[in-house]
Amino acid sequence: MPEEAETFAFQAEIAQLMSLIINTFYSNKEIFLRELISNASDALDKIRYESLTDPSKLDSGKELYIKLIPNKTAGTLTIIDTGIGMTKSDLVNNLGTIAKSGTKAFMEALQAGADISMIGQFGVGFYSAYLIADRVTVTSKNNDDEQYVWESSAGGSFTVKADNSEPLGRGTKIVLYIKEDQTDYLEESKIKEIVNKHSQFIGYPIKLLVEKEREKEVSDDEADDEKKDDEAKKDMDTDEPKIEDVGEDEDADKKDKDGKKKKTIKEKYTEDEELNKTKPIWTRNPDDISQEEYGEFYKSLTNDWEDHLCVKHFSVEGQLEFRALLFIPRRTPFDLFENQKKRNNIKLYVRRVFIMDNCEDLIPEYLNFIKGVVDSEDLPLNISREMLQQNKVLKVIRKNLVKKTMELIEELTEDKENYKKFYEQFSKNLKLGVHEDSNNRAKLADFLRFHTSASGDDFCSLSDYVSRMKENQKHVYFITGESKDQVSNSAFVERVKARGFEVVYMTEPIDEYVIQHLKEYKGKQLVSVTKEGLELPEDEAEKKKREEDKAKFEGLCKLMKSILDSKVEKVVVSNRLVDSPCCIVTSQFGWSANMERIMKAQALRDTATMGYMAGKKQLEINPDHPIVEALRQKADADKNDKAVKDLVILLFETSLLSSGFSLDSPQVHASRIYRMIKLGLGIDEDEPMTTEDAHSGGDAPGLVEDTEDASHMEEVD
């Protein structure tokens, strides 16, 4: 008695995705075949890999292939592979109840106008079958389980049951019941066209069951018998030859040895035709391969719907032999920096035999956007993942891949337009490389691009910056911050720009990590204009003026330090300000204001490190600013004047904000500003507040008159 089918509901996101696929019009439905062939190829890769360590895995079927069977009579297209197959739990989980991470991301991309052909990149390619089929059955046999069949007409549920029909041995058979308006996908010519376009570089034979004709000589009696048999079978789907009378031979009197007349008839028969006889592209001479061929191979390898940006095809010979084909895609994948995501961008082959596609030791993490193939002559076929980690050959391959990738990016820099596209997508990867890869740091630094105070809207390289440096300029000056507008208007760049020195604007959070490791470039030290100890080239007159200013404002600096106490490490006369009265700088080895902001946003930040790294601040005052000069005169007249204390605190808090820091008590600072606005508008301090104000108890600290308020201001950071 046959086992009853179990019914399962599709996971909500998968049901949504299927509904989207079925109910939306897509013009390029043909990608369904690419996706199903790609999945079949993956299944074949898995069984071949398992068989390297356990050859008995192939006892259930030695031949590894993909077969396509169109049946116009039944209206079905069948895709068979002799891959690893699926167990019952695989069928339930992989085809419906567990959504992959890409399901939601793909739906969002689709709704945002992305192409349906992107589906394979998100790991949900199987569901593209419903572009052309209204019902799908998947029969599968894994070595570790019985044969089961999965079936769904996409109505929100699917069934799985044991299958006692024709045994597969091992592998998967997908039957697509083609929609009435999609029957052109049953035509041989259409299938050949799609396979040639999308899947010609699959590493296993793709066989298509085709119908052919041949002429055959038979006697009249045999012809009559075969004709009758053929008529009897004409409605049945069969591989038996079909007979068609093509008239008698030219020699009507020609007879066989029994004296019977002979006829030539046309016989129809079916046979497998291999569609992808092209040998692996990476084994061919690069000079013989067109850009179109590289493009087709890239798409079949990655399921990308766009062409690659550039390609590097090379071979290494000598003590170690391997061939490789490396591609840079046009855009970043949606999950590029997901830590838990297994990378499968570079497929590792040994002597044309696929070994694995998620070998983490093949290329460093910061280059995880590179896609391609590596085919080694020296690795053992049955190498395990554990053995790979210790393998010296792999380390040499990795070193060569990194070197060739650097060459590829360097070649790309010569094409400004394409490099701009590349940099917009992958600049974070290059910067991560500067942070992580000390051996290639100098080379990666050449690839970085930034806005500067002299570059306008264009990006420029550090090499361009160095070539424009003034004769008396010793350092590369830079500033980090949130945006180009913010840093270009910062108080820190005033004097540097006024002196004609160019400043590099670093406005991405990752730049803070880059400069921790990129201390110099081409012998020029990188100097932050927001850190203490900024030295600008100066002549004797400027030196003399600076010494005079130091002496003149020494008393004010000491007074300000005593008022601000532990809030600052010291107060000094600045050599970097022009228009601003003061600014807050950090110590050489502490965090900049921008880094402090980034670290405060970290959910898992270390508060002990925060206190240590963010603790040291220095207040710099501008000796040429009228506010500072007036404050000095007021302090010299009476250093105990409460107004001086109030103004010092107000200046300090305002400079914290303008220097990119945040206030611990913004409300107290705001209250002081409101009090100043009141004074500016001539509103009497003693004027009674409205009822709401009285209830809120919103008593703001005074600025000048109220002694108690003034001392309160002194205590608040």
From Swiss-Prot:
Homodimer. Interacts with shu. This is Heat shock protein 83. Its main location: cytoplasm. Residues 225-245 have a biased composition (Basic and acidic residues). GO terms for molecular function: ATP binding; ATP hydrolysis activity; ATP-dependent protein folding chaperone; unfolded protein binding. The keyword Membrane does not apply. One of its GO terms (cellular component) is cytoplasm. Disulfide bonds: none annotated. Pfam families: HATPase_c_3, HSP90. CDD domains: HATPase_Hsp90-like. Keywords: ATP-binding, Chaperone, Cytoplasm, Nucleotide-binding, Stress response. The TPR repeat-binding motif mediates interaction with TPR repeat-containing proteins. Molecular chaperone that promotes the maturation, structural maintenance and proper regulation of specific target proteins involved for instance in cell cycle control and signal transduction. Undergoes a functional cycle that is linked to its ATPase activity. This cycle probably induces conformational changes in the client proteins, thereby causing their activation. Interacts dynamically with various co-chaperones that modulate its substrate recognition, ATPase cycle and chaperone function. Required for piRNA biogenesis by facilitating loading of piRNAs into PIWI proteins. A motif (TPR repeat-binding) lies at residues 713-717. Residues 213-263, 687-717 are annotated as: Disordered. It comes from Drosophila pseudoobscura pseudoobscura (Fruit fly). It is found in: Cytoplasm. ATP binds at residues 39, 81, 100, 126, 385. Belongs to the heat shock protein 90 family. It comes from the Eukaryota.
